[in-house]
Every structure is written in C-alpha cells, then in structure tokens.
C-alpha cells in the first residue's frame, strides 16, 4: 500500500483516488496494481473491519480523500453498490463533491492510473464505468480471447 499522503513532483494536478471495500480487499487491489505499475501517487486504500460502524468508515474515507486530493477532485472506487463502504462514500460525496464508482475491478484501476492527469473526477468516473464494463467478459464464450491466450 502506498504511504498515506505520498507525494512526488509528478503527483500534482491529478485526480486523487480512494479505493474502499470489504475487509482488506481495497488494500490488496492497490498492492496488486502497484505490483504491476510501481508506486502510484495520490492513491490510497481504506481498510475496514466487519464490525466497524458507518461513522468510522466515513471518517477513514474522508481522511484518505484529504490526503490524495491533488487539485482535480477525488474519485472513490468501491467494491459493490449498496454496502456500508459505498453508502458512506456517497454520503461523503454529497458534501465534498467527490465522485463514487461502485464495482471496481483491476482493468479499471490500471486505466485510472494512466488517465487521471488528463481529466477531472466526474469525466474519469464515466470513462471508468464504461471501461470496467467492457472488461467483464465471459471468456469461454469469447473465442478470440481464448485463441490469443493459447
């Protein structure tokens, strides 16, 4: 996981990213992303325990958002719609202007790491939704994908 608030000379003027999910899922997704791309600035995972009350989850999201904000807004990615983490992210978004996308997957994170200097959080949320959906594939029913793998 990147160090909280990690900054470099290249980390200004980009969309800040907070990944939130059940248990340690967000932390592991960020760790995997950084295993592929190296350290990603202005990116933070929020870890929640099953017994954490909603207020504690929201406080962690708020703190992480403050640390990753680099001037182009904050995008919060959650694991699924309707859970405590997403609901608390949405409550925070109502007062902060952050954007929230539920249903995060690895292709979305990789795209995000490479596209967030080119746009703002709202436009990036729309791009990620489309990109994430395009990369959910019934692989055994996609012969071209299977042939490429062989």
Regions found by a protein language model. Give the residues of each.
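N-terminal loops that bind phosphate or other acidic moieties
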Residues: 2-150
């Amino acid at each position: 996981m990147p160090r909280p608030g990690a900054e470099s000379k290249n980390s200004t003027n980009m969309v800040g990213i907070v990944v939130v999910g059940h248990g340690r899922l967000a932390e592991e997704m960020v760790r995997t992303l950084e295993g592929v791309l190296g350290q990603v600035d202005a990116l933070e995972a929020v870890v929640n325990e099953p017994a954490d009350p909603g207020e504690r989850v929201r406080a962690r999201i708020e703190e992480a958002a403050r640390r990753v904000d680099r001037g182009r807004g904050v995008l919060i990615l959650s694991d699924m719609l309707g859970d405590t983490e997403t609901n608390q992210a949405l409550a925070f978004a109502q007062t902060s202007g952050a954007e929230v996308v539920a249903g995060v997957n690895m292709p979305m994170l990789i795209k995000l790491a490479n596209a967030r200097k080119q746009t703002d959080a709202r436009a990036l949320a729309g791009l990620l939704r489309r990109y994430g959906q395009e990369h959910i594939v019934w692989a055994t029913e996609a012969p071209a994908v299977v042939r490429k793998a062989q």
